[in-house]
């Protein structure tokens, strides 16, 4: 029987969350993502304005989960992820709560295992297209975990992380792409970004996001430089 990808966060996964594979619904078909309708599409704020690593086109929700970048380290990579909390459900404040250490373990049976995690991403793009920033781009967010890019391990130190609210099993929204592409261009104007990649590409076999449904060709057509080897 096919297995369902189910987000399982493990404290041993330094600076990140791990994704294990199993079927949580024995004897049933894989669970389909719960779809909560997104608000009407909104045009994201189009800006290249940054202040101390904070993008002025985002809602700012500071997280305590970050580390200073090593002296002399430059930001050269953007890593795309997906996340949904509770798993396969959209909307609500759980992702923001996770990244700010305010997750309520009583709110959902899945949440107790998240309470002691200290993870974050620089940005979250919600299904509506709302962009939320948690960590200054000048600092290292705790998003990539055990990872490697072009022979360099520990991608947190030289990357920016963007979480897209979603999962591996359905497309992202039009509003998310409308927000993501201007954000990527703004990042490239502010930082010496060399390429954009996925978590699945820097942690193969351990991670699968942003997943099969992410539209890499759309990014390439918009002039975003993708990491070598990304074709779809």
Q: Where is each model-derived feature located?
A:
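Short hydrophobic targeting helices and cationic amphipathic motifs
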Residues: 7, 14-15, 20, 26
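N-terminal catalytic cores of peptidoglycan-degrading enzymes
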Residues: 12, 37, 41-153
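Basic/polar, cationic surfaces and motifs that engage anionic cell-wall
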Residues: 47-56, 68-72, 153-160, 167-232
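Conserved beta-strand segments that form the floor/walls of ligand-binding pockets within enzyme
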Residues: 124, 161-163
């Amino acid at each position: 029987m096919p297995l369902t990808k189910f987000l399982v966060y493990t404290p041993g996964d330094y600076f990140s969350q791990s994704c294990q594979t199993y079927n949580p619904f024995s004897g049933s078909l894989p669970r389909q993502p719960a779809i909560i309708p997104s608000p009407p599409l909104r045009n994201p704020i189009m800006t290249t304005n940054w202040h101390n690593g904070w993008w002025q086109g985002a809602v700012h929700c500071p997280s305590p989960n970050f580390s200073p970048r090593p002296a002399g380290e430059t930001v050269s990579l953007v890593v795309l992820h997906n996340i949904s909390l509770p798993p396969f459900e959209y909307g609500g404040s759980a992702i923001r709560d996770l990244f700010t250490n305010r997750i309520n373990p009583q709110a959902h049976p899945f949440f107790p295992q998240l309470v002691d995690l200290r993870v974050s991403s620089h940005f979250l793009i919600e299904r509506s297209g709302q962009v939320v920033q948690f960590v200054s781009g000048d600092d290292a967010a705790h998003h990539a975990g055990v990872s490697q890019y072009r022979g360099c391990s520990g991608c947190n130190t030289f990357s920016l992380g963007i979480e897209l609210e979603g999962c591996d099993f359905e497309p992202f929204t039009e509003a998310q792409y409308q927000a993501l592409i201007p954000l990527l261009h703004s990042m490239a104007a502010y930082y010496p970004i060399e390429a954009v990649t996925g978590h699945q590409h820097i942690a193969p076999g351990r991670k699968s996001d942003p997943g099969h449904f992410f539209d890499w060709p759309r990014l390439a057509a918009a002039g975003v430089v993708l990491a070598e080897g990304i074709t779809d």
